[in-house]
């Protein structure tokens, strides 16, 4: 894989109703970076994140993930590389049990059934929730759901983790636990958030989005000093 594993050049996206989502976004991320994407509601953060896993394709410009330009033809390869954690865990948890949810991705990627249990339990243990494996997701707390949703992405062994508001709705203890877990991950991390304290703790770099464009890009402590 290329050392510069995420590169956006003049990225634009216009929704079907003509509303611009992002405008002229350019940046380059190198392997192992942790980058916060910050900005007000409606700035374009979520639109940008949805490009990184190929849920949206750019109207104009290019996006490269490792060795793959983001195109319809390369979606499978891009999605093996990038794991997406949505803001609402209920958007990711839909199977009868936690184990089934975390196993869903590896099975779809074609991992041999005999290996699936191992990767599922490793992912659950990484998030500190192996005891939840037989529970139905709808009976979990918000923090437990978030941990399981992240485990469901870790089980697919992505190189890059993309997260939308990972600390949203968590109580202080669950938030602090998640921050410590994120700091321990060696993945490249791209995290959209309004939680600026979390950004300072987890991300050495921050990209500021305003009205769909990049208005600042630099060290988190310099940009978010307050």
Regions found by a protein language model. Name each.
Residues 38-40:
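The feature captures the beta-strand-to-loop junction immediately N-terminal to the Walker
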Residues 136-140, 144:
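Conserved ABC ATPase signature
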Residues 114-132:
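Conserved ABC ATPase "signature" region
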Residues 161-164:
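Catalytic Walker B motif of ABC-type/P-loop ATPase nucleotide-binding domains
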Residues 193-194:
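H-loop/switch region of ABC-family ATPase nucleotide-binding domains
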Residues 53:
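Helix-to-loop junction immediately C-terminal to a conserved catalytic motif
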Residues 213-226:
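Conserved beta-strand-loop-alpha-helix hinge in the C-terminal portion
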